[in-house]
């Protein structure tokens, strides 16, 4: 099914930017709410901080950029196209996205599922590039906050 050629709809850049903005603000609000409820760092963040101290900052930054793009291609392109129904697409890719980030608590689990759902919403409303850009911007924000 995935190897068949399909027509890719062109997405207006304004629409893409609009949904990246909506997604970013939504992720920010959700993350702030979860942080107020439970201010403990996640297993994923602890692993990233440990890795950050082992490699030069530029290599780590490239790793984050690469991870954002590869994750979005896997979840919001390959797996996304294996399922036809939108609600199942979003649910499946969000749960798998959360599992890949090793949530250690129920709240961390909810946060990563929410992140996956918003990335899925942006993927649906714009395109893969929209979700890749949002994921990348989000990772860069988290990385810069980890530096301070």
Task: Name each model-derived stretch.
Residues 57-148:
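Transmembrane helix-loop-helix hairpins at the membrane interface
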Residues 3-67:
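Juxtamembrane helix-loop-helix connectors linking adjacent transmembrane helices
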């Amino acid at each position: 099914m995935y190897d068949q050629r399909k027509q890719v709809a062109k997405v207006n850049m304004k629409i893409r930017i609009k949904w990246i903005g909506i997604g970013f603000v939504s992720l920010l609000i959700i993350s702030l709410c979860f942080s107020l409820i439970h201010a403990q760092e996640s297993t994923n963040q602890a692993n990233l901080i440990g890795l950050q101290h082992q490699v030069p900052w530029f290599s780590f930054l490239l790793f984050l950029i690469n991870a954002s793009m590869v994750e979005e291609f896997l979840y919001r392109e390959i797996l996304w196209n294996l399922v036809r129904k939108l609600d199942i697409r979003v649910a499946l890719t969000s749960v798998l996205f959360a599992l890949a980030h090793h949530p250690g608590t129920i709240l961390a689990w909810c946060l990563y599922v929410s992140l996956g759902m918003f990335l899925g919403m942006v993927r649906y409303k714009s395109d893969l590039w929209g979700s890749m850009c949002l994921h990348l911007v989000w990772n860069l924000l988290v990385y810069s906050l980890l530096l301070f």
